[in-house]
Amino acid sequence: MQRYLISYEFNDGEYQEKGGDMLVKWYETGGVEIRPETYEVYSWVFMIQNGTGHCVVRADSLVTIWKLWHPWRKLMDISIQPCLDLEETISLIKKTRP
């Protein structure tokens, strides 16, 4: 599985409010428990004052990520980038040195 940084920003205050309602509903209906085994969340940060957030996940594919994030896609700009943690970064640097 690959680690990814997901960054998102709501397009406006109305979309942020609607997204918040969707998040509460998802959470209260067991959303966390019904994530696929091929999707793990390591950290999640949301700055409510400006409608932006970031999370670091491990997933088997971008398809898995987009299936989970699809409901919010029209409400916010979402970017997904591969990333590494510190140990992975150090390991990669060591492998690429002569």
Each model region followed by its residue ranges:
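Conserved, structured core segments of small domains
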Residues: 1-98
